[in-house]
Protein backbone atom coordinates (compact mmCIF):
# COMPACT_ATOMS: atom_id res chain seq x y z
CA UNK A 1 0.00 0.00 0.00
CA UNK A 2 1.23 3.53 -0.64
CA UNK A 3 2.06 5.31 2.60
CA UNK A 4 0.70 8.59 1.29
CA UNK A 5 -2.88 9.66 0.80
CA UNK A 6 -3.86 12.30 -1.77
CA UNK A 7 -6.12 14.22 0.61
CA UNK A 8 -3.23 14.54 3.06
CA UNK A 9 -0.68 15.89 0.57
CA UNK A 10 -2.08 19.41 0.35
CA UNK A 11 -4.45 21.71 2.20
CA UNK A 12 -7.65 23.33 1.01
CA UNK A 13 -7.93 25.74 3.93
CA UNK A 14 -8.58 29.40 3.20
CA UNK A 15 -8.04 32.67 5.04
CA UNK A 16 -11.34 33.92 6.43
CA UNK A 17 -12.45 37.30 7.73
CA UNK A 18 -13.40 37.48 11.41
CA UNK A 19 -17.13 37.54 10.59
CA UNK A 20 -16.88 34.57 8.22
CA UNK A 21 -14.77 32.63 10.75
CA UNK A 22 -17.28 33.27 13.55
CA UNK A 23 -20.18 32.29 11.30
CA UNK A 24 -18.41 29.03 10.37
CA UNK A 25 -17.54 28.27 14.02
CA UNK A 26 -21.11 28.95 15.15
CA UNK A 27 -22.38 26.68 12.37
CA UNK A 28 -20.11 23.90 13.63
CA UNK A 29 -21.39 24.33 17.20
CA UNK A 30 -25.05 24.38 16.11
CA UNK A 31 -24.56 21.27 13.95
CA UNK A 32 -23.14 19.51 17.02
CA UNK A 33 -26.06 20.80 19.11
CA UNK A 34 -28.71 19.55 16.68
CA UNK A 35 -26.98 16.17 16.25
CA UNK A 36 -28.54 13.98 18.95
CA UNK A 37 -25.67 11.47 18.61
CA UNK A 38 -23.21 14.07 19.96
CA UNK A 39 -22.96 14.11 23.76
CA UNK A 40 -23.87 17.54 25.13
CA UNK A 41 -20.50 17.97 26.88
CA UNK A 42 -18.69 17.09 23.65
CA UNK A 43 -19.90 19.85 21.34
CA UNK A 44 -17.35 22.08 19.60
CA UNK A 45 -16.48 25.18 21.65
CA UNK A 46 -15.91 28.75 20.45
CA UNK A 47 -14.87 31.45 22.95
CA UNK A 48 -14.31 34.96 21.63
CA UNK A 49 -13.91 38.47 22.94
CA UNK A 50 -16.42 39.74 20.36
CA UNK A 51 -13.73 40.83 17.91
CA UNK A 52 -10.56 39.66 16.20
CA UNK A 53 -7.86 39.53 18.87
CA UNK A 54 -4.09 39.85 18.64
CA UNK A 55 -3.77 36.13 19.35
CA UNK A 56 -6.05 33.17 18.68
CA UNK A 57 -5.56 29.47 19.32
CA UNK A 58 -7.16 26.25 18.15
CA UNK A 59 -7.10 23.21 20.46
CA UNK A 60 -7.43 19.67 19.10
CA UNK A 61 -8.39 16.81 21.41
CA UNK A 62 -7.01 13.27 21.34
CA UNK A 63 -8.17 9.93 19.95
CA UNK A 64 -11.56 8.87 21.43
CA UNK A 65 -11.78 12.11 23.46
CA UNK A 66 -13.78 15.27 22.66
CA UNK A 67 -13.62 19.10 23.11
CA UNK A 68 -14.39 18.72 26.82
CA UNK A 69 -10.75 17.59 27.20
CA UNK A 70 -9.62 21.17 26.45
CA UNK A 71 -12.55 23.17 27.87
CA UNK A 72 -10.71 24.21 31.05
CA UNK A 73 -7.33 24.91 29.44
CA UNK A 74 -9.28 26.88 26.83
CA UNK A 75 -10.50 29.14 29.66
CA UNK A 76 -6.88 29.78 30.73
CA UNK A 77 -6.01 30.99 27.21
CA UNK A 78 -9.28 32.94 26.87
CA UNK A 79 -8.60 34.75 30.16
CA UNK A 80 -5.15 35.65 28.80
CA UNK A 81 -6.81 37.48 25.89
CA UNK A 82 -7.01 34.75 23.26
CA UNK A 83 -9.92 33.86 21.04
CA UNK A 84 -10.21 30.07 21.41
CA UNK A 85 -11.68 27.44 19.08
CA UNK A 86 -11.97 23.80 20.21
CA UNK A 87 -13.53 21.75 17.39
CA UNK A 88 -14.90 18.23 17.72
CA UNK A 89 -13.03 15.70 15.59
CA UNK A 90 -15.44 13.76 13.30
CA UNK A 91 -16.97 10.55 14.75
CA UNK A 92 -15.82 11.60 18.25
CA UNK A 93 -17.88 12.55 21.31
CA UNK A 94 -20.81 10.37 20.29
CA UNK A 95 -23.22 8.56 22.62
CA UNK A 96 -21.51 5.31 21.60
CA UNK A 97 -17.88 6.30 22.08
CA UNK A 98 -16.61 3.23 20.19
CA UNK A 99 -17.89 4.90 17.03
CA UNK A 100 -14.72 7.04 16.91
CA UNK A 101 -13.42 4.02 14.97
CA UNK A 102 -15.72 5.07 12.09
CA UNK A 103 -13.55 8.11 11.29
CA UNK A 104 -12.25 8.31 7.71
CA UNK A 105 -9.16 9.89 6.14
CA UNK A 106 -11.26 12.27 3.96
CA UNK A 107 -13.18 13.39 7.08
CA UNK A 108 -9.92 13.97 8.98
CA UNK A 109 -8.47 16.02 6.11
CA UNK A 110 -11.66 18.06 5.77
CA UNK A 111 -11.73 18.64 9.55
CA UNK A 112 -8.11 19.84 9.66
CA UNK A 113 -8.63 22.20 6.71
CA UNK A 114 -11.98 23.68 7.78
CA UNK A 115 -10.78 24.13 11.39
CA UNK A 116 -7.66 25.94 10.15
CA UNK A 117 -9.80 28.21 7.97
CA UNK A 118 -11.84 29.16 11.05
CA UNK A 119 -8.85 29.92 13.29
CA UNK A 120 -7.27 32.02 10.52
CA UNK A 121 -9.93 34.71 10.99
CA UNK A 122 -9.97 34.81 14.78
CA UNK A 123 -6.61 36.45 15.51
CA UNK A 124 -3.71 38.40 14.00
CA UNK A 125 -1.36 35.64 15.15
CA UNK A 126 -2.81 32.13 15.17
CA UNK A 127 -1.54 28.84 16.49
CA UNK A 128 -2.53 25.36 17.54
CA UNK A 129 -2.41 23.22 20.68
CA UNK A 130 -2.96 19.47 20.34
CA UNK A 131 -3.00 16.51 22.69
CA UNK A 132 -2.00 13.00 21.59
CA UNK A 133 -3.67 12.32 18.20
CA UNK A 134 -4.64 16.00 18.24
CA UNK A 135 -0.93 16.91 18.40
CA UNK A 136 -0.39 14.62 15.40
CA UNK A 137 -3.10 16.58 13.52
CA UNK A 138 -1.55 19.86 14.74
CA UNK A 139 1.80 18.79 13.26
CA UNK A 140 0.17 18.18 9.86
CA UNK A 141 -1.75 21.47 10.03
CA UNK A 142 1.43 23.38 10.89
CA UNK A 143 3.26 22.04 7.82
CA UNK A 144 0.45 22.37 5.28
CA UNK A 145 -1.05 25.63 6.59
CA UNK A 146 2.09 27.50 7.50
CA UNK A 147 0.77 30.81 6.27
CA UNK A 148 -1.80 30.54 9.07
CA UNK A 149 -0.02 28.75 11.92
CA UNK A 150 2.98 30.45 13.52
CA UNK A 151 3.19 28.54 16.79
CA UNK A 152 2.34 25.07 18.05
CA UNK A 153 2.23 23.38 21.44
CA UNK A 154 2.28 19.60 21.12
CA UNK A 155 1.22 17.74 24.27
CA UNK A 156 1.97 13.99 24.53
CA UNK A 157 2.11 13.82 20.71
CA UNK A 158 1.03 10.47 19.30
CA UNK A 159 2.90 9.68 16.07
CA UNK A 160 3.33 6.01 16.87
CA UNK A 161 2.51 3.82 19.88
CA UNK A 162 5.27 2.90 22.32
CA UNK A 163 7.02 -0.43 21.76
CA UNK A 164 5.50 -1.70 25.03
CA UNK A 165 2.02 -0.86 23.69
CA UNK A 166 2.56 -2.09 20.11
CA UNK A 167 5.80 -3.84 19.03
CA UNK A 168 7.37 -1.97 16.09
CA UNK A 169 6.75 -4.86 13.65
CA UNK A 170 3.01 -4.48 14.32
CA UNK A 171 2.86 -0.76 13.43
CA UNK A 172 2.61 -1.32 9.63
CA UNK A 173 -0.20 -3.82 10.31
CA UNK A 174 -1.99 -1.24 12.44
CA UNK A 175 -1.56 1.33 9.69
CA UNK A 176 -2.41 -0.81 6.67
CA UNK A 177 -4.84 -3.46 7.89
CA UNK A 178 -6.77 -1.38 10.43
CA UNK A 179 -6.03 2.11 9.10
CA UNK A 180 -7.35 1.08 5.67
CA UNK A 181 -10.35 -0.79 7.17
CA UNK A 182 -9.28 -4.20 5.85
CA UNK A 183 -9.69 -5.85 9.25
CA UNK A 184 -12.83 -5.38 11.38
CA UNK A 185 -12.28 -2.90 14.19
CA UNK A 186 -10.77 -3.97 17.48
CA UNK A 187 -10.11 -1.97 20.65
CA UNK A 188 -7.25 -1.51 23.09
CA UNK A 189 -7.71 -2.08 26.83
CA UNK A 190 -8.55 1.62 27.17
CA UNK A 191 -11.15 1.40 24.37
CA UNK A 192 -9.13 3.09 21.62
CA UNK A 193 -10.12 1.95 18.14
CA UNK A 194 -7.36 0.21 16.15
CA UNK A 195 -8.91 1.59 12.96
CA UNK A 196 -8.72 5.14 14.32
CA UNK A 197 -5.15 4.71 15.63
CA UNK A 198 -4.10 3.36 12.23
CA UNK A 199 -5.44 6.49 10.53
CA UNK A 200 -3.50 8.82 12.83
CA UNK A 201 -0.36 6.87 11.90
CA UNK A 202 -1.30 7.41 8.22
CA UNK A 203 -1.50 11.18 8.87
CA UNK A 204 2.04 11.12 10.30
CA UNK A 205 3.23 9.29 7.17
CA UNK A 206 1.92 12.17 5.10
CA UNK A 207 3.98 14.90 6.72
CA UNK A 208 6.24 16.77 4.32
CA UNK A 209 9.43 14.80 3.70
CA UNK A 210 11.54 17.68 5.05
CA UNK A 211 8.94 18.52 7.77
CA UNK A 212 9.30 22.19 6.78
CA UNK A 213 6.59 24.61 7.88
CA UNK A 214 7.41 28.07 6.45
CA UNK A 215 5.98 30.76 8.72
CA UNK A 216 6.41 28.67 11.86
CA UNK A 217 8.13 30.66 14.63
CA UNK A 218 7.93 28.35 17.62
CA UNK A 219 7.22 24.74 18.62
CA UNK A 220 6.85 23.53 22.21
CA UNK A 221 6.53 19.89 23.25
CA UNK A 222 5.48 18.53 26.65
CA UNK A 223 5.41 14.84 27.55
CA UNK A 224 5.05 13.05 30.88
CA UNK A 225 7.67 10.68 32.25
CA UNK A 226 4.84 8.33 33.22
CA UNK A 227 3.37 8.14 29.71
CA UNK A 228 3.68 4.57 28.45
CA UNK A 229 1.34 5.00 25.44
CA UNK A 230 3.48 6.86 22.90
CA UNK A 231 6.84 6.52 21.17
CA UNK A 232 8.63 9.30 23.06
CA UNK A 233 11.61 9.51 20.71
CA UNK A 234 9.30 10.38 17.82
CA UNK A 235 7.25 12.65 20.11
CA UNK A 236 10.31 14.85 20.57
CA UNK A 237 12.25 14.32 17.34
CA UNK A 238 9.52 15.00 14.78
CA UNK A 239 8.65 18.44 16.25
CA UNK A 240 12.35 19.18 16.83
CA UNK A 241 13.18 18.43 13.17
CA UNK A 242 10.16 20.45 12.03
CA UNK A 243 11.37 23.43 14.07
CA UNK A 244 14.93 23.10 12.72
CA UNK A 245 13.73 22.82 9.10
CA UNK A 246 11.55 25.89 9.58
CA UNK A 247 14.03 28.08 11.46
CA UNK A 248 11.69 28.07 14.47
CA UNK A 249 12.52 28.08 18.17
CA UNK A 250 12.05 24.70 19.87
CA UNK A 251 11.41 23.88 23.52
CA UNK A 252 10.82 20.54 25.22
CA UNK A 253 9.81 19.67 28.75
CA UNK A 254 9.11 16.34 30.45
CA UNK A 255 6.72 16.36 33.41
CA UNK A 256 8.48 14.54 36.29
CA UNK A 257 7.16 11.15 37.38
CA UNK A 258 6.48 12.59 40.85
CA UNK A 259 3.41 14.39 39.44
CA UNK A 260 1.77 11.00 38.86
CA UNK A 261 0.37 12.12 35.49
CA UNK A 262 0.08 9.70 32.57
CA UNK A 263 -0.66 10.24 28.87
CA UNK A 264 -3.56 12.74 29.18
CA UNK A 265 -1.78 15.73 30.69
CA UNK A 266 -4.66 18.19 30.14
CA UNK A 267 -8.16 17.02 31.13
CA UNK A 268 -9.36 17.77 34.64
CA UNK A 269 -11.18 14.42 34.81
CA UNK A 270 -7.69 12.98 35.41
CA UNK A 271 -7.31 13.26 39.20
CA UNK A 272 -3.59 14.07 39.16
CA UNK A 273 -4.03 16.71 36.43
CA UNK A 274 -6.79 18.33 38.48
CA UNK A 275 -4.59 18.24 41.58
CA UNK A 276 -1.76 20.08 39.76
CA UNK A 277 -3.84 22.22 37.37
CA UNK A 278 -2.90 25.48 39.11
CA UNK A 279 0.74 24.77 38.16
CA UNK A 280 0.17 22.95 34.86
CA UNK A 281 -2.23 25.33 33.10
CA UNK A 282 -0.17 28.54 33.48
CA UNK A 283 2.87 26.44 32.50
CA UNK A 284 1.16 25.27 29.28
CA UNK A 285 0.25 28.87 28.42
CA UNK A 286 3.87 29.94 28.98
CA UNK A 287 5.14 26.98 26.94
CA UNK A 288 2.80 27.89 24.08
CA UNK A 289 4.04 31.49 24.18
CA UNK A 290 7.64 30.28 24.06
CA UNK A 291 8.70 31.59 27.44
CA UNK A 292 11.67 29.85 29.03
CA UNK A 293 9.84 28.16 31.87
CA UNK A 294 10.09 25.17 34.13
CA UNK A 295 7.34 23.46 36.05
CA UNK A 296 7.59 24.11 39.78
CA UNK A 297 8.76 20.88 41.41
CA UNK A 298 6.00 18.77 42.89
Which ranges hold each PLM region?
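Short beta-strand/loop motif that positions the catalytic acidic residue
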Residues: 215, 221-227
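Catalytic active-site module of serine/aspartate enzymes centered on a nucleophile-bearing elbow/loop
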Residues: 262-298
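Catalytic nucleophile-loop/oxyanion-hole region of alpha/beta-hydrolase
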Residues: 94-122
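Gly/Ala-rich beta-loop-alpha elbow adjacent to hydrolase catalytic centers
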Residues: 129-138
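Hydrolase active-site cap/lid region
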Residues: 6, 149-198
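Catalytic histidine neighborhood in serine/cysteine hydrolases
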Residues: 243-266
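Short alpha-helix in the alpha/beta-hydrolase fold that links the catalytic acid
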Residues: 73, 217, 231-243
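Short, surface-exposed "cap/lid" segments of acyl-processing enzymes
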Residues: 37-92
Amino acid sequence: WPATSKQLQSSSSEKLSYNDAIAAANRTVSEDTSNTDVRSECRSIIKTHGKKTTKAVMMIHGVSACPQQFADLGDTFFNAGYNVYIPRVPSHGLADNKRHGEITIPAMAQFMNSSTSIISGLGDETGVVGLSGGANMATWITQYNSQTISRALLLSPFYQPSASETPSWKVPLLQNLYGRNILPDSFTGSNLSYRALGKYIIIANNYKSDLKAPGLKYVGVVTSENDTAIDKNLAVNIPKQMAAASGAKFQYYSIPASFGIGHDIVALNQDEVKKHADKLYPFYLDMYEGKDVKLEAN
